[in-house]
Amino acid sequence: MNKISLAILLAFTMTSGATFANEQTLSLGYAHADVQNFNSLSGVNLQYRYELNSPLSIIGSFTYMQGDGSAQYYVANDFVKNDVDVKYYSVLAGPSYRINDYISLYALGGIAYVKATGTTKWINATLDYTGHYSLSEKSTSFAYGAGLMINPVENVSMTLGYEGTEADLNGNYAINGFVLGIGYRF
């Protein structure tokens, strides 16, 4: 009896791996975005895809980007210097549709969190006066994305996608970027 049970368990274990093969993909990639009236942001994107037993699958995505900028200018007798640091985080999820063995399209929706911190320093040359001002703005907004996944060979996945949102940081700023990644199917 034990030999029969062991044989059934062994057969099940050997065949179950074949049925679940290549149903998951983990991708890591480069993320880059342009921010309206600001410098660009750069960072990393992580995607996880689970393929169902149909052309449909589910994708989850996490993106982290950061960037900084500075500006210096004169206003009358004042010298002004602004420094800003921006951090962007997003968590998105959505469906993917496999067109054939090589190409899939996906759409994502979720939440983006943006934090901008900065300082302004001004110096008045005639009054010999120095002033400082600090700011910190946060925004949580709807984010969206779409893209293409290509499987050039069985266990490799390449991703090219778009991600965007509009952050309310004392005014609305459009953030539009792309994701370029490579992944492993298992």
What are the functions of these language-model segments?
Residues 97, 149-151, 155-157, 175-186:
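Outer-membrane beta-barrel "beta-signal"
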